[in-house]
């Protein structure tokens, strides 16, 4: 936990989900730069906030006036809720998911520059369509994470944009809303999957082509399951792994799980195309948390990037959740880069960890408390 001093007071902020021996703060100087701009240049009380990460922006900006938040990440919204409770504040007000529309016009917009360039483009288009002409927009990020093409993209999608002075290794960018769409973002994109072309909405992993890890995983899916088996595609992205399983085993009941709203939207649209008659559900949340059920099979290709943070902390959390959510005799089937050494983590959690396939870069493991499921023959 760290103390966050901002223009309207002080907050105690904790990074969520919590990790042992956390070394990172729940805020950075890009947050402070945006709040400084809000304090000095706000046009009115109501602020729209995009891509807050841990609650620093909406909690602090509430000292200026009412806020509306918008973004794609469940974990970011959950962190805001938890930090509000930590500081004895009211539950958050309006939150807009990517396809939502503004119910009222904000006086200004503050926005963290997202890591994914595609999501940045899509959000700039969204702002151009939603905001009244002339509404001030301020974007910020840490220098080391900013894309070089940010100002050209602002000019393309908003009709204007400029970089301002750097401050404590952060940089601010400013624009005014054009009042109408200037350019159509090329999303969703489409990638080739084993069942056909798959939609991939902005910001979802593997925007231009199916990643090589997923391609290898597709060759090591189960060939049989109990009738009516309950399966989770954990961290589903565009849904290709779960959909490939449904192509082979259409009677299983599948839950697509992701913390990205746009990932689940991609999976849902692809399931409508390629698995229209299947029993599919969609869970927006922190992995399997919040699902009151157990599974015969969990399929997982865990990310090792959490925003700009690299590590195995996401995989560790999803491994633990999977162990708790498996039925007796159920299996976690997981793929990972060979150099990440997931077998050590998995061996500490599961009685049995079998290598089901490997190449120079990837390994597929079947993990169970006892027997597992049959692998697809090589």
Whereabouts are the PLM-identified features?
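Class I S-adenosyl-L-methionine
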Residues: 158-194, 204, 337-378
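A short glycine-rich, Lys/Arg-flanked "PGG" loop and its adjoining helix->strand segment in the class I
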Residues: 122-133, 316-328
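N-terminal auxiliary segments of SAM/dcSAM-dependent transferases
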Residues: 2, 111, 115-193
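Mobile active-site "lid"/loop adjacent to the S-adenosyl-L-methionine
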Residues: 261-262, 299-323
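Conserved proline-anchored active-site loop of SAM-dependent methyltransferases
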Residues: 108-118, 234-238, 295-308
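Short beta->alpha hinge that forms the Motif I/post-I loop of the SAM-binding pocket
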Residues: 71-75, 142, 258-263, 314, ...
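SAM-dependent Rossmann-like transferase core, predominantly class I methyltransferases
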Residues: 19, 24-28, 33-37, 166-228
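Conserved SAM/SAH cofactor-binding pocket of Class I
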Residues: 26-92, 212-300
């Amino acid at each position: 936990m760290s103390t966050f001093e901002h223009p309207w007071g002080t907050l105690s902020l904790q990074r969520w989900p919590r990790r042992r021996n956390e070394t990172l703060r729940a805020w950075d100087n890009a947050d402070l730069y945006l709040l400084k701009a809000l304090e000095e240049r706000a046009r009115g009380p109501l602020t729209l906030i995009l891509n807050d990460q841990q609650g620093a922006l909406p909690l602090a900006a509430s000292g200026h006036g009412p806020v509306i938040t918008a973004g794609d990440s469940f974990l970011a919204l959950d962190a805001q809720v938890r930090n509000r409770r930590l500081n004895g504040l009211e539950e958050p007000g309006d939150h807009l998911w990517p396809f939502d529309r503004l119910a009222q016009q904000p006086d200004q917009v503050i926005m963290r520059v997202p890591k994914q360039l595609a999501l940045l483009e899509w959000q700039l288009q969204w702002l151009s369509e939603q905001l009244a002409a002339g509404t001030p927009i301020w974007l910020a990020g840490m220098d080391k994470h900013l894309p070089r093409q940010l100002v050209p993209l602002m000019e393309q999608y908003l009709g204007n944009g400029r970089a301002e002075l750097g401050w404590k290794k952060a940089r601010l960018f400013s624009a005014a809303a054009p009042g109408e769409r200037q350019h159509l973002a090329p999303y969703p994109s489409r990638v080739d999957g084993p069942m056909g072309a798959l939609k991939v909405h902005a910001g979802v992993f593997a925007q231009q082509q199916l990643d090589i890890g997923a391609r290898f995983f597709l060759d090591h899916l189960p060939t049989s399951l109990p009738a009516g088996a309950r399966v989770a595609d954990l961290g589903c992205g565009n849904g290709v792994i779960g959909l490939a399983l449904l192509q082979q085993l259409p009677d299983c009941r599948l839950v697509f799980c992701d913390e990205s709203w746009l990932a689940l939207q991609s999976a849902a649209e692809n399931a409508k195309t390629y698995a229209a008659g299947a029993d599919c559900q969609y869970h927006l949340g922190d992995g399997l948390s919040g699902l009151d059920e157990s599974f015969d099979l969990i399929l997982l290709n865990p990310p090792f990037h959490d925003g700009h943070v690299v590590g195995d902390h996401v995989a560790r959390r999803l491994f633990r959740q999977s162990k708790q959510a498996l039925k007796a005799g159920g299996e976690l089937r997981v793929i990972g880069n060979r150099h990440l050494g997931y077998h050590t983590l998995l061996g500490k959690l599961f009685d049995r960890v079998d290598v089901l396939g490997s190449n120079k870069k990837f390994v597929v493991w079947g993990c169970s408390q006892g027997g597992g499921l049959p692998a697809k023959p090589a």
